Each structure stands twice: as C-alpha cells, then as structure tokens.
Amino acid sequence: MNIGVPKEIKNNEFRVSTTAAGVHALVAAGHKVFVEQGAGVGSAISDEDYVKAGGTILNSADEVWEKSDLILKVKEPIKDEYHRIRSGQILFTYLHLAASRECTDALIKSGCVAIAYETVEVNRRSEEHTSELQSRQYLVCRLLLEKK
C-alpha cells in the first residue's frame, strides 16, 4: 500500500502523523511511504531521518495525496486540502466532524474512507477511547502490517 504523510497546514499545528520509526516499520512490512518535504520539521524529524527509515520525500502535498492510498494526518483536513481527497482513498486522522459541517460534507462528496482517531478503540469491550498515539499505533500496525 502507498501511504502518505503530508505536512500539516492547519494554523498552529506543528505535529506530524508518523515518526521515522513508524515509517521504518511500515516500509519493513512492504509498504511505500511518501512524506511531504518538511513534514516533520515541527516535531524535530528531518527529511533525512525519513529517508534513512526508507521513506520517500516528495516536494509537494499534491504529490503526496496523489500517490497515496492511505493518508495519515494529525488534524482534520481544512478547506485548502479538500480538493486533494479522492474516492476510495483512506484518510486516518482526528476529524472532529461535529464541529465542521463543511469538512463533513467535503469528505462525503469525495467518496473517501475517513477514519477518526477519536473513535478508534483498542479493546472492543472497552468504552474508553484511546490516546492519539495508541490509536495510530494500534490501527496502522495491526491492519497494515498484517497485510504484508
């Protein structure tokens, strides 16, 4: 699977969805990981770190979204990103859909498969939601790495 890590463009959001170690694990499982140039800068992860982990650095967000079957983000897409989302593409991020009808409508219109971090549970019997880190690690590692 082709996995994309675009740079976050929402105001005051400096995190990145995947560390170099995460990229290494995904690549080791047979996936291709495309990281937008500078995506990790706000989290002190260099492009070189991603390359050493097996990722491919792309120059633009458009390239990352275009080449990727799965997009890993931290925050919900904003208006400037809606046009990049395509039918059948998987978007895994915090969505907070109750707060944005516009985002909800854009996701529906795109035909993508949107998975919200805040709704992922580690234990199906548990009513407790996972932390940001747990939800990403669990779903990405469990689902993607098993598809090797």
Language model regions located:
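Structural/interface elements that position substrates and couple domains in central-metabolism enzymes
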Residues: 1-127, 131
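Positively charged, low-complexity/disordered segments
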Residues: 132-148
